[in-house]
Amino acid sequence: MIHHRNRNIAIMQLAIEELERKVSTDIIISVAVDEFGINHKPKIEHLVNLMDNAIWEE
């Protein structure tokens, strides 16, 4: 199960980085919440925002 989660995190990071922000963070958050559960939504939002901010700083 952890292997799948690592893969899914990598896919979400790829979507943010390689698609040049064409995929909105709202969509990525929604998909991650579906994958990991609503209890993790605050942490997911925080991580997605950190990744998004890091991309804008490059």
Residue positions per predicted region:
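N-terminal acidic leader/helix
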Residues: 1-30, 47, 54-56
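Short, basic interhelical loop/turn and adjoining N-cap
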Residues: 33-44
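General structural signal for secondary-structure boundaries
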Residues: 5, 39-41, 51
